[in-house]
Amino acid sequence: MTPATRNNDSAVAVADAFDDTGDGPPTAARFAALAACWRQPDDDLQAALAAETDTTVDAQSLRAEYTRLFVGPGPSQSPPYESVYRDGERDADLGPVYGSSTQAVARWYSEYGLQPAASESAPPDHLATELEFAAYLREHEGAETLEQFLTEHPRNWVESFARRVRDADPKPFYRTLLNVTVDTLARADTPL
């Protein structure tokens, strides 16, 4: 998303995110780090995770798990897109990618003069992009604006997404990331 938090160093964002504990509201750094972790894993994420956890992160394994859970082959078990969970005809049906929810979240970005980076191939309602926008709102706008966005968008679908991810029996990295993300979205309405 430009301009926004993607220019943060991944290692700093990951470190800040997971040092952010307690009952207070999540920081912009926490939202940004979560966004980085929900994207297709790359060497920068691997290096940041390895530096912050003092463990070896197997990038190939992380990429394979990301692909299994969120990409395919075949139909993705847990697509990380809002429209898939909100734009189906019935609660049990998955909706289309690039549905009406995609357009609604894109209007939020546009209202603040933001748009996904040109290099971004995922739809604007990808969980990582929504979390990145939450980081922007936390840093540049009031808590009320952030709360409105979270209520209208990620909180409206992340529980359905979380159930599908859990049903797919994710490896520890994605199970933990999912739990931290759900907790972060729940805590975000804590006053600044």
Curated annotation (Swiss-Prot):
Against InterPro entries, the record matches this protein to: DMSO/NO3_reduct_chaperone, TorD-like_sf, TorD/DmsD_chaperones
Induction conditions: By anaerobic conditions. Its expression is under the control of DmsR.
Effects seen without this gene: Cells lacking this gene fail to grow under anaerobic conditions using either DMSO or TMAO as terminal electron acceptors.
Q: Which UniProt keywords apply?
A: Chaperone
The record's listing under SUPFAM superfamilies reads: TorD-like (SSF89155)
Q: Name one Pfam family in it.
A: Nitrate_red_del
**Gene3D superfamilies the UniProt entry points to:** TorD-like
Under PANTHER family, the record lists: CHAPERONE PROTEIN YCDY (PTHR34227), DIMETHYL SULFOXIDE REDUCTASE CHAPERONE-RELATED (PTHR34227:SF1)
Q: What does this protein do?
A: May be involved in the biogenesis/assembly of dimethyl sulfoxide (DMSO) reductase.
So what family is this one in?
Answer: Belongs to the TorD/DmsD family.
Q: What is this protein called?
A: Putative dimethyl sulfoxide reductase chaperone
Q: Which organism is it from?
A: Halobacterium salinarum (strain ATCC 700922 / JCM 11081 / NRC-1)
Source organism phylogeny:
Archaea, Methanobacteriati, Methanobacteriota, Stenosarchaea group, Halobacteria
Gene of this entry: dmsD
